[in-house]
């Protein structure tokens, strides 16, 4: 069984999904997506409430790491290794796609790192926004480069 909570953040509405006491998804809704009335429950789980609290603290600049259980229910073993490596990038720091490729033991997989970032199911908690190009340019971001820039500014990187 899963529960969903919609959270209004400074970057837009985040859909947070929990399954079996683990966060399995944090997704930024696009303008064309709507809040699913069938998924909204009147009572939220303690974990979803904790997730909202921690996200509020993060966006207020009061939290630099998340202490929420995460489980990857999608993706390949390679993508899981990338997402776990991303969780080790500290707040206020960035790594290049090449750095992550080296960290997962596949230095030539730079493009695959970018694809894994694009498929990251747990936005913010798995900080794919902290991965930039080797030359220091921001690179891509599934939610748009402006949001990536906003998150890196929040963290004091830019």
Give the location of each predicted region:
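Regulatory, non-catalytic segments
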Residues: 108-120
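Basic nucleic-acid-binding alpha-helical/helix-turn surface characteristic of O6-alkylguanine DNA
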Residues: 1-108, 154, 158
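Short Lys/Arg-enriched helix C-cap and helix-to-coil transition segments
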Residues: 124-131
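Short clusters of hydrophobic/aromatic residues that line enzyme substrate/ligand-binding pockets
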Residues: 68-72, 113, 138-141
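…primarily DNA-binding HTH/wHTH and HhH modules…
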Residues: 135-158
């Amino acid at each position: 069984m899963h529960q969903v909570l919609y959270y209004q953040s400074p970057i837009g509405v985040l859909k947070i999904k929990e399954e079996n006491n683990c966060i399995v998804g944090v997704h930024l809704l696009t303008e064309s997506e709507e809040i699913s009335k069938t998924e909204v429950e009147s009572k939220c789980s303690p974990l979803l409430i904790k997730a909202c609290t921690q996200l509020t603290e993060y966006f207020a600049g009061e939290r630099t790491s998340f202490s929420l259980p995460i489980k990857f229910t999608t993706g390949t073993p390679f993508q899981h290794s990338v997402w776990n490596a991303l969780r080790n990038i500290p707040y206020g720091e960035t790594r290049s796609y090449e750095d992550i490729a080296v960290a997962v033991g596949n230095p030539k997989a730079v493009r695959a790192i970018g694809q894994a970032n694009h498929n990251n199911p747990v936005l913010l908690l798995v900080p794919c926004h902290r991965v930039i190009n080797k030359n220091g340019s921001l690179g891509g971001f599934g939610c748009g480069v402006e949001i990536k820039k906003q998150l890196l500014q929040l963290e004091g990187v830019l």
